[in-house]
From Swiss-Prot:
One GO CC term on file: extracellular region
Coarse class of the protein's main subcellular location: secreted
Protein name: Probable N-acetylmuramidase
Residue ranges occupied by any LysM domain in the UniProt entry: 243-286, 319-362, 393-436
InterPro entries: Glycosyl_Hydrolase_73, LysM_dom, LysM_dom_sf, MGlyc_endo_b_GlcNAc-like_dom
UniProt keyword list: Antimicrobial, Bacteriolytic enzyme, Cell cycle, Cell division, Cell wall biogenesis/degradation, Glycosidase, Hydrolase, Repeat, Secreted, Septation, Signal
Region (Disordered): 217-244, 290-320, 367-392
Signal sequence, renumbered to the chain: 1-57
EC number: 3.2.1.17
Compartmental location: Secreted
Gene encoding the protein: acmA
Length: 437
């Protein structure tokens, strides 16, 4: 029988106990940590049932898996000041290259995080090594809509876990770890008790050149972002402007578009972006126009600070219902004279599944607001363009923030905050910019 990665990984435990044949054992987790409602839950030793021996995929299949998860891992790691290479290696190691039952659809739990996610969980048998022996338990594990939410949850664990003496995983952050090897060393004995955990991660990172995903972001990156604008007068009373913006931690295309008064589509078009994923340190061209009283054919260079943004349509009224036994999206769409697609859009549903007790928006009307754009700038000719303030309020997420708390603070419904910021779940990240009004 082939020797699995996990057997090799936990070889130091062989003398203490025999591994039950009915289970598969990945990385040993920290025994005292627990992830419930966004904090770390108990996972000492996760054993997944298997029907056949698990063997590492061939190199080409490995690269396919790496690329498939890197698209989610890199932006999440960058936004949280973590090494993408380490996060990808963790996902590979914890899920055995995505072959564990928990990591596959429809569960997408790459890191074995316990608890519930948006009310969803799945029960698996786990084993914990307690008092010198293995104890088997049935425990609930989080079910995610996609790998992206799994990475976000893992980042939340690494950034917010605190047992009273400061952030528990702080030494694994890029700001405190000069190299990825320093980060993996900091995880060993904390994230996993296996003494070879860091070495296993380092081997994967080196073998598959995962440092290529660490990109422009560097340890201790203090880049606060910024923009430089070149304004060109076209003799018609309108200045066409091109702003170069440097992406910083927590930025999203939506947040940048709101601050600069242009659409996400405009940013994507100007920068040939095929998705909404952006990276720390990336340069983005933001194009727009500003009215001016200049009448000559002069070129002016200016540094500018954005002061306005577009105000999207605001919900003026909405009807919500609590799902009861027998309800379906189809029945609700018929009853409230709307479409299933519209219900899914309002409620950010990725499938047609709804749950008893779930609150759903079933009707919503909105009044469009006129966009206002402009920027205050200091140019070489000492002329200033006027600007107007939008009604939007942008908030930078700090430790302890929740959607519910921001909703209470701003007076805006949670559903509105999620709609304005294109959030598909209630998970928000430290450093993230959110429109809350």
């Amino acid at each position: 029988m082939p020797v699995s990665r996990v057997k090799v990984k936990n070889r130091h435990l062989k003398k203490k106990t025999k591994k039950p044949l009915a289970f598969y054992k990945p990385a040993t987790k920290f025994a005292g940590a627990v992830l419930i409602a966004g904090t770390l839950t108990t996972t000492h030793e996760l054993l997944l049932q298997q029907t056949s021996p698990m063997v590492q995929a061939a190199t080409n299949s490995s690269e396919v898996f790496i690329e498939s998860i890197a698209a989610s891992a890199k932006p999440v790691a960058d936004a949280n000041g973590l090494y993408p290479s380490v996060m990808i290696a963790q996902a590979i190691l914890e899920s055995n290259w995505g072959s564990s039952q928990l990591s596959r659809a429809p569960y997408y739990n790459l890191f074995g995080i316990q608890g519930t996610y948006q009310g969803k969980s799945v029960v698996f048998k786990t084993q914990e090594y307690l008092n010198g022996k293995w104890v088997t338990k049935d425990m609930p594990f989080r079910v995610y809509p996609s790998f992206n939410q799994s990475f976000q949850d893992n980042a939340y664990v690494l950034k917010t876990t605190n047992f009273g003496n400061g952030p528990y995983y702080a030494k694994a952050w890029r700001a405190n770890a000069a190299t990825y090897q320093d980060a993996t060393a900091a995880l060993t004995g904390r994230y996993a008790t296996d003494p070879s955990y860091g070495a296993s991660l380092n081997r994967i990172i080196s073998q598959y050149n995962l440092t290529r995903f660490d990109g422009a972001s560097s340890a201790g990156n203090t880049n606060s972002g910024g923009s430089t604008t070149t304004i060109t007068n076209n003799n018609s009373g309108t200045n066409s402007s091109s702003t170069t913006y440097t992406v910083k931690s927590g930025d999203t295309l939506w947040g940048i578009s709101q601050r600069y008064g242009i659409s996400v589509a405009q940013i994507q078009s100007a920068n040939n972006l095929k998705s909404t994923i952006i990276y720390i340190g990336q340069k983005l061209v933001l194009t727009g126009s500003a009215s001016s009283t200049n009448s000559g054919g002069s070129n002016n260079s200016a540094s500018t600070t954005p002061t306005t943004s577009v105000t999207p349509a605001k919900p003026t009224s909405q009807t919500t219902v609590k799902v009861k036994s027998g309800d379906t999206l189809w029945a609700l769409s018929v009853k409230y004279k709307t479409s299933i697609a519209q219900l899914k859009s309002w409620n950010h549903l990725s499938s047609d599944t709804i749950y008893i007790g779930q609150n759903l928006i079933v009707s919503q009307s909105a009044a469009a607001s006129n966009p206002s754009t402009g920027s205050g700038s200091t140019a070489t000719n000492n002329s200033n363009s006027t600007s107007s303030n939008s009604n939007a309020s942008i908030h930078k997420v700090v430790k302890g923030d929740t959607l519910w708390g921001l909703s209470q603070k701003s007076g805006s419904p949670i559903a509105s905050i999620k709609a304005w910021n294109h959030l598909s779940s209630d998970t928000i990240l430290i450093g993230q910019y959110l429109r809350i009004k």
